[in-house]
Amino acid sequence: MGRRVEVTISIDDLHPEKGWGCEGDESVEYLQKPNDEFGCKFTLFVPSFYHKKYPLSEHKEWVDFWLDKDWVELASHGYYHMCEDSDRFGECEFFEINSVDKAEKTVELCLEEWDKVGHKPVGWRNPGWLINPLIKDSVDDKFDYVALHTEHNRGLNWSSKMLFGHDGINETDSINIWNDNTFMFQSHIAGDWNDNCWTKENYLNFRNVIEYLLSEYDISFKTLKEL
């Protein structure tokens, strides 16, 4: 048996829209399979009012569908996951916000949606990875950990536990050990502009990666909050 390591798998942008993490979706099947076969666990980063169309407060059954799975953690991924000036900021919601008051109000609204469905997320990932440094503290004191990108974090120091790592489920030859002893896989549930979605091709690739890691290491699968 090889070195003892941990493996985490995070997935961004799930919300209660068909094709984006709903019961019966093909992508959801590709999450269930590695849990059944290997015991994989997943941290799902969820915007609480995606694109102003899918408030969690109106979709409690969707939240409960995921919370009923003991191998899933639901974490926060912003409020709207969209910007007023999308040409300039894309969907980097908290990079566009440039005032503390607006940031605090947005975080408050974000967490209210979660509260209405009876769940308090302990983890956070910035939509689009980026955040305006001026408003970092508005987010920082609300969560136990933040999931970060080494480049896009741009040297910011958070008081919350900082978890780095973003290797894609579609990758095979550029996988790293992060945070001393953890393989940190990052992906998206859908979106044809992303190359790390849970398609059949990526699922099969990732299954091969997990089989290889299991042959080389003593693996413990974890959600991010379990690190």
Give residue spans per PLM region.
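Active-site beta->alpha N-cap acidic-glycine motif
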Residues: 1-71, 218
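C-terminal domain-boundary segment and adjacent tail
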Residues: 2, 36-39, 145-150, 189-227
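Active-site flanking residues adjacent to catalytic metal/cofactor-binding acidic residues
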Residues: 11-12, 76, 148, 185-187
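A short acidic (Asp/Glu
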Residues: 19-21, 54-57, 133-138, 195-197
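Well-ordered, non-membrane alpha-helical segments in soluble/globular domains
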Residues: 22-31, 56-61, 100-108, 199-212
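Metal-dependent polysaccharide deacetylase catalytic core of the NodB/CE4 family, i.e.
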Residues: 40-132, 187-193
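His/Asp/Glu-enriched short active-site or ligand-binding loop at hydrolase and phosphoryl-transfer sites
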Residues: 137-173, 221
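A conserved mid-domain beta-alpha-beta active-site/ligand-binding segment of alpha/beta enzyme cores
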Residues: 156-181, 186-197, 202
